[in-house]
Structure formats: structure tokens, C-alpha cells
């Protein structure tokens, strides 16, 4: 990524906008040793890929004193979800990493936007065998993500209904969350990473 960023910057200068949007998901269990390899792969793509993309452009944008760095995380990053521990952990790490980057670039003229979508109709979610509330089409999700980035929102949860759900989940006492999460549907485990 660094080489590609260097080539881009040498040719065009610091970009006005960089969006890091990569993600993989697979059902995992924390109590299965075999799933550690899946965890490693999910973290590599969802966290390291996002960080490497944004970090490659951040110095030039900081030097230019302008621009927006946007990372796509997920509402799944707000609480650990059963059967999706790797995905939840990766998106939680992405949210926290973007928050740290925002603090580091404060006052530089470079905005850092973290977008946390709920369910989007993509090949990745089509394998889910459970109801996905407030499912957005890819086109509608893209429109809402663009609006959030243009507004330079520090944290954008879309759709708004998922923002309410995520607030409720974060405010929920641990003992209650544990009981409800134990009954939640799991991601399919037979999807390759």
C-alpha cells in the first residue's frame, strides 16, 4: 500500500479523500482452536488493511493541511456477537483505531470519519440465515455513507435505526446482554475466509 500511495501522491499530490472499505466475515467461535486462524485473517483484512490504507496517505494530507480519511467499520464493533467474535473484534478495533487517528490529527485540517453501517445487502450478508433488521441496498448504503463523509461526521451509524439499536446495546448491563446474546443467531461457519 505504501508504494501505491507514494506513486499516487507523486503524480497527483495529497488526495482530498481516502476511504478504507475492506471487510471479510466468517462465523467463528472463541472456544475452538481452529478458529484462531480465521480470527487472524479477519483482523489482517479488517484492521491492518484499513490502517495501512489510511496511514499511507495521512502524512501527505497532514502536510497539505486538508482532506478526509474515512474508515468503514460496523455496528458489530460495538458489542461482541456470538458466532461472530472475529468480525466484532475486528470492527471494534477499527472503530478504536480511527478514534485514535482522529485525536492524532486533531487541528491538522484532516478529518477522520468512522462509518458503522448495519446490514447491507451484499454477497457477504446473503449467506446469513437469520433476519437482518433495517437491511439497506448497497446503493442506499453508499448514498448514506457519502453524506456522512461529506458532512465529516466523526462517527456515523447507518441507518439511524441501527444507531438506536447500537446505543441500547452499549448501554445495556453486561448481565442482560449476556443473556440476550446467548440466544442470538450465529453466522454460518462454512464460509471461506
Identify the residue ranges that each predicted region occupies.
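Conserved mid-core segment of classical short-chain dehydrogenase/reductases
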Residues: 25-40, 83
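Conserved amphipathic alpha-helix within the SDR
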Residues: 1-13
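Active-site-adjacent segment of SDR/Rossmann-fold oxidoreductases
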Residues: 79, 100-111
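Residue(s) in the substrate-gating loop at a strand-loop-helix junction
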Residues: 74
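Active-site loop-to-helix junction immediately N-terminal to the catalytic Tyr of the SDR YXXXK motif
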Residues: 80-88, 100, 128
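C-terminal helical subdomain
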Residues: 114, 130-165
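Active-site helix of classical SDR
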Residues: 54, 90
